[in-house]
Amino acid sequence: MGKRDNRVAYMNPIAMARSRGPIQSSGPTIQDYLNRPRPTWEEVKEQLEKKKKGSKALAEFEEKMNENWKKELEKHREKLLSGNESSSKKRQKKKKEKKKSGRYSSSSSSSSDSSSSSSDSEDEDKKQTKRRKKKKSRCHKSPESSGSDSASDSKDGSKKKKKSKDVTEREKDTKGLSKKRKMYEDKPLSSESLSESDCGEVQAKRKKSGEERERTTDKAKKRRKHKKHSKKKKKKAASSSSDSP
């Protein structure tokens, strides 16, 4: 059995296109574009000059537009100038009105001040009359009420004096105690400065502390001995129990 032949013939595309011949194109070719009719230099100059001059209709239109624009500018300027003048006049009028109103307000304020001062004087007169009436009523009170008031006042004064005296005495006592404490703290406790009674008290305290220490040591020794004796008994009991079987 032989292998199948899968070879394909190679075809050159350029050669195939040449064999077909020229394509019939519908339209101008490149050669037609290159061979087009061209104007001479003189004709070009004439066209440029015409462009520079421009058309007469366009020139007339531009002139009319410029004239209209100038007229509008003049109108606008006139309006602005008239508006500025009117605004300046309005400002002057407002200033005059303010001055007039200020004068009227000053006169009204002066009148109001005078009225307020008169009302204040009336209020003061009323207050003075009320005070006089109160004083008269106090003077006309019964002498008994005045005596009771004076007695209560004297009692209150005596109580306050006693309290102040007690407070001052307490403060003095506290100050004296604090001074004594500071003196004792500052002075060193030497054998020469201490008195005989102080020495006796110190010795007694030392003896008591020594006796207490001895007692505590004796108790500790007894406890230790008791512990040792109990341990020995336990050991003997354990050894006897082990020997018996």
From Swiss-Prot:
The modification Phosphoserine is found at S82, S190, S191, S193, S195. Coiled coil: none annotated. Keywords: Phosphoprotein. Residues 69-80, 165-176, 209-219 have a biased composition (Basic and acidic residues). InterPro entries: Fam133. The keyword Phosphoprotein applies. Residues 19-38, 69-245 are annotated as: Disordered. Residues 89-102, 128-140, 220-237 have a biased composition (Basic residues). Residues 103-119 have a biased composition (Low complexity). Belongs to the FAM133 family. This is Protein FAM133B. The lineage of its organism: Eukaryota, Metazoa, Chordata, Craniata, Vertebrata. The gene is Fam133b.
